Regions:
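Active-site-proximal mixed secondary-structure blocks
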Residues: 1-167
């Protein structure tokens, strides 16, 4: 992987998110990844940022809440099976779920990403807030996505680095 400037990126963010991604966070003893598909890229407080949404019961949320840094990794379509698995199996249920994929973790001091990723964003957490029933204008969203009232948490991270797979 090589580091590039964010201004060098040329992609459609909607296409990128359509193919899912993995958010990964760690603590001193472990790391965990989960699939995400809700989010977006933008700017906040004069910083380049990305937003993602995670339900409160997800194991990765516990790690995110205790670490200021995390990564979001994007993959070629050939890794869809791994992303599907990591989105289905919770770290709450299987602490060894990461070893059941063919992904190779690259573990650095504050972060973890994957050797197989085509694009990795490294983030510093800037803002966290839980969505609320009252804040959701279209009530069909609640019926379709939050029958259990497990409203997602919104995470906004400042993009610290961008890594791209070398060809």
């Amino acid at each position: 992987m090589k580091e590039i400037k964010i201004e060098e990126l040329t992609f459609n963010p909607f296409d990128l998110l359509k193919d899912w991604a993995l958010v990964t966070s760690k603590n001193q003893d472990e790391f965990n990844s989960m699939t995400i598909s809700w989010g977006g890229f933008g700017s906040l407080w004069n910083k380049y940022t990305a937003t993602m949404y995670i339900r409160p019961q997800r194991y990765t949320k516990k790690l995110l809440d205790n670490n200021d840094y995390y990564t979001i990794s994007f993959f070629d379509k050939e890794y869809k099976k791994e992303l599907s698995y990591l989105g289905t199996i919770s770290g709450n249920d299987d602490k060894n779920k990461m070893s059941n994929t063919k992904l190779t973790p690259v573990i650095e001091e504050e972060i973890v990403y994957y050797k197989e990723a085509k694009l990795v964003f490294i983030f510093k957490k800037e803002y966290v807030n839980q969505l609320t029933k009252d804040g959701i204008i279209d009530k069909k969203v609640i019926e379709q996505n939050y029958q259990n009232k497990d409203y997602s948490y919104e995470y906004i991270g400042k993009i610290e680095k961008v890594l791209i797979k070398e060809k």
